[in-house]
Structures are given as C-alpha cells and as structure tokens.
C-alpha cells in the first residue's frame, strides 16, 4: 500500500510522538529551523529519515497548506473490535463510543476524531461500506487526534451494535423528531452514540437497534446541524455529566 502523506507542523509532530510508523520526514528547503525545532528534535530521537525538498514537491504531495513540513507514514491501522471490548471490561469507568452510520465527509470524520480525543471518547466506529475511511484528509482535519483515538472499522454495523449492547453499552441514536432532548441524556452508563450521515441520517435498521433517541433542539430556520457539530455537542454533554465542576470555595 502507498504511504499516506501527513502535512502541517502540528499533525506531523503528533505522528512522530505517537510512534506511528513513519518512513520519512520532508522539510521544505529554506524553512527556518527554529520554526520546526520540535519536529527535528523528535525525529532525531527516533532516528527518522529527514529529507530537505523543494517547496514544489511538498505542494504536489500535499495539495493543501503544509507549513513546510510533511511526513510519509504507513497507512493507518484500524483498531480491533474484540480487543477494544476486552480493554473496556478492565476499565473502572463508563465508556463512550461514537458510531458513525454512513458518514462520508473526511473533514467531518477528522473533526469528530479531534473532539473525541479532547472529550475522552474511547473509540469511533465506522462501517466498511458507504463510509469515509482513514485518509490523508482525515488525518489533516484531525490535527493529530487520529494518532490517539482508536477507529474501528466493521463489516456489519447492526451486529456490532448488538455486541456492544451485550457488553453493557446503551445505544443512543440522534434523531430530529420523536426524541428526547439531548440535555436529558443519562451518562451513568457506557454509551454508544450514533451519528447519521450528512444527508440521510441514521439508517432504519440502525435506528431500530437504538435503546433510545435523542435530539438537539433548534429554534432557528435550519432543521439540521453538521454531523461533526452534532457529534461534538453529544460528546461534551456526556463529558459534562461525568465531570461535574468542583464547587468554588
């Protein structure tokens, strides 16, 4: 398989720190070394190959703003679902997974991974068919979070939901109608939160598998939110419920 190109100083730094298999670091000719000192220091400590290249080569490889640095990395590996379940059984806290039903926009997936990392989500689950995969665009949009959040790719989303439920998870599906306000979501349980596709929402089969449905109230003129925005609201509502503010003295 071909290398994936990661671009941008923060994303490259996170890739190095995470220990992902990096084949080569590419640095733009003429860039000031103090601007990428952390990258060079970490690359040296891991004995990575660092090559200086013309800006034109980075422009060609990245096809996006690259800040003068790129990393050629091995394709991202997906986490194993069974191994994930075993790890969750050993945890002394409730778990949270985000289940993406047919999400196709790589920028949305990258943004969801970024918020998932920030809010302590344990994994993101995507189906193999009719869904975005882990790509260079996803990596860039995640600003490094792709290195820290397990992404599980499954053949049958409906069956996976059944297995989650068998292992103590409650499944909450996001719907626009006939659903409970998401602010009433109970978080004292392990949760799987389903986010539907940008255009169609959840599939009927997946919706029927949900234990309950939640909605985000809207009082404006639009009737839906971007998938990554909706997911972010859900993730931080769970975080808020589980991490109460300490009373100020």
UniProtKB/Swiss-Prot annotation:
Residues that, per the record, bind S-adenosyl-L-methionine: 196, 216, 225
GO cellular component: cytosol
GO molecular function: RNA binding; RNA methyltransferase activity
Broadest EC class assigned to this enzyme: transferase
Keyword Methyltransferase found: yes
SMART domains, A to Z: SpoU_sub_bind
GO biological process, one term: RNA processing
Keywords: Methyltransferase, Transferase
Family: Belongs to the class IV-like SAM-binding methyltransferase superfamily. RNA methyltransferase TrmH family.
Full protein name: Putative TrmH family tRNA/rRNA methyltransferase
Annotated organism of origin: Staphylococcus epidermidis (strain ATCC 35984 / DSM 28319 / BCRC 17069 / CCUG 31568 / BM 3577 / RP62A)
């Amino acid at each position: 398989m071909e290398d994936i190109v990661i671009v941008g100083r923060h994303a490259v730094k996170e890739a190095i720190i995470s220990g992902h298999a990096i084949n080569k670091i590419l640095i733009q000719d003429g860039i000031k070394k103090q601007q990428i000192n952390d990258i060079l220091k970490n690359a040296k400590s891991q004995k990575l190959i660092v090559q200086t290249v013309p800006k034109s080569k980075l422009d060609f490889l990245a096809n996006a703003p690259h800040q003068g640095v790129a990393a050629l990395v091995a394709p991202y590996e997906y986490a194993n679902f069974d191994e994930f379940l075993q790890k969750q059984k050993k945890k002394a806290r409730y778990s949270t997974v985000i289940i993406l039903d047919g999400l196709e926009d790589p920028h949305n997936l990258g943004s969801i991974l970024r918020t998932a990392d920030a809010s302590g989500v344990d994994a993101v689950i995507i189906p193999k068919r009719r869904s975005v995969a882990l790509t260079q665009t996803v990596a860039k949009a995640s600003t490094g979070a792709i290195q820290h959040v397990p992404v599980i790719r499954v053949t049958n989303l409906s069956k996976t939901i059944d297995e989650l439920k068998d292992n103590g998870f409650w499944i909450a599906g996001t719907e626009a109608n006939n659903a409970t306000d998401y602010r009433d979501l109970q978080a004292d349980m392990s949760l799987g939160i389903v986010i539907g596709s940008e255009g169609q929402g959840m599939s009927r089969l997946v919706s029927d598998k949900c234990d309950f449905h939640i909605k985000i109230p809207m009082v404006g003129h639009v009737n839906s939110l971007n998938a990554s925005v909706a997911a972010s609201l859900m993730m931080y509502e769970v975080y808020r419920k589980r991490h109460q503010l300490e009373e100020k003295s």
